[in-house]
Amino acid sequence: MDDYKRILITKILKNEVTEALGCTEVGLIGYAVSLCNISDPFSIEKIELTLNNGSFKNAYAVGVPNTKKYGILPAVVGGLLGDHKNKLLVFNGIKYSQKLEDFIKERLKIRVINSPLYCGVKIKDNSGNTFESLIKDNHLNVVIPKINNKLISEINGSEKEEYKNLELLDFLEYIDEIPEEIIQLVEKTIYTNNNLIKGDFLNFGNDCLSNMVNKTTSACNTRMIGENMPAMSVAKSGNMGIMATLPIIAYDYSNEQNQEKLIKSILLSVLVTIYATYKSSYLSSMCGCVSKGGMGAVIGLCYYKNGKNIKKLDSAARTFTANLPGIICDGGKVGCALKLASGCFAAYSSLFVDISYENGIVGKNFKECVENISEISKIMGDLDSDIVKIMSKKEI
């Protein structure tokens, strides 16, 4: 592998594999609010929060760490109490205030737009000062932090387009000689996500597939109820990080318990998950944890079982594509664990069946499969507005 590709992949990994506390969309809201640096939250006269459909869905009914609350309002309040330097760990160490929640509730206006990832905050205080922040396109891409219309800083995006042009062979070459800093990152990812397993969400037994389902769903449930425990997110999604890692961790536990093979397989899964995300989008009407994290998991599992066998890897991608893509995303919630259970079954069964190119949207190889799923994901984009309308009718 040439040096440029290796440097590019390493940079992407360091940007896209990060700790997140709670569902990444409530973390996104909290981070955006915290960027406004409000010294006295009780001075706020009004606060306007603008979210794209996907961010609204994922924050609507999910637990917010250190609040014992669910949804968008406590995420805003938590952001006012948090430190922007913590980014997606913004709720770390906050002391929640019910009094502040009651105060903000009367002053918060939420607007939902049809857009790629977008979280904008506008705050006006009782002295006439205005504070703004805008995060768009990815969860850490801060575009506008302003005080009284003065730009504080601006951060540009990454080499996403170049990464999208890489091939599966590039990822396989990269994991042959992994930089030490990335080995440490993968080890941290394994430890952090494994630590999320708390009891049983679904307990089907002790065979390999059951262990995959048990561990993956338990970790997902821990995140979705808002436990004060970080996950290592992949492509800015904690659940996608769980789907891309825990099925492989469980498979290794039930089979060889080979640390070197586990690290390579996890890393390959993560690289594929990021690739699939860049080919489509961070958020969409299609469940990314299953369609993107699941594709990562199946490629990682197939590598663990069969090594660098392109024929087998293409076969696994085809079989996975014939199964689960198309599952809708109706927001972050406890029910996400059930979707990840389906993802585990689809990934595992893809190791043993070869579905041919003639079936439905199945591509000839891994790359075509990812591109076809991405195309379906983009076509499904208009569904988000309808999903949000249905969710907004609820009183919770």
Swiss-Prot record:
Catalytic activity, EC: 4.4.1.28
Cofactor note: Binds 1 [4Fe-4S] cluster per subunit.
Named cofactor requirement(s): [4Fe-4S] cluster
Coiled-coil regions, chain positions: none
Residues annotated as the enzyme's active site: C23 (proton acceptor)
Cysteines joined through disulfide linkages: none
First-level EC class: lyase
Record GO terms (molecular function): 4 iron, 4 sulfur cluster binding; L-cysteine desulfhydrase activity; metal ion binding
Positions contributing to [4Fe-4S] cluster binding: C287, C329, C336
Reactions accelerated catalytically: L-cysteine + H2O = hydrogen sulfide + pyruvate + NH4(+) + H(+)
Taxonomic superkingdom: Archaea
Keywords for this protein: 4Fe-4S, Iron, Iron-sulfur, Lyase, Metal-binding
A Pfam family this chain is assigned to: SDH_alpha
GO BP annotations listed: L-cysteine catabolic process to pyruvate
Assembly information from the UniProt record: Homotrimer.
Family: Belongs to the L-cysteine desulfidase family.
Function: Catalyzes the cleavage of L-cysteine to form 2-aminoprop-2-enoate and sulfide. The former then spontaneously hydrolyzes to pyruvate and NH(3). May be responsible for the production of sulfide required for the biosynthesis of iron-sulfur centers in this archaea.
Protein name, UniProt field: L-cysteine desulfidase
Species of the source: Methanococcus maripaludis (strain DSM 14266 / JCM 13030 / NBRC 101832 / S2 / LL)
Lineage of source species: Archaea, Methanobacteriati, Methanobacteriota, Methanomada group, Methanococci
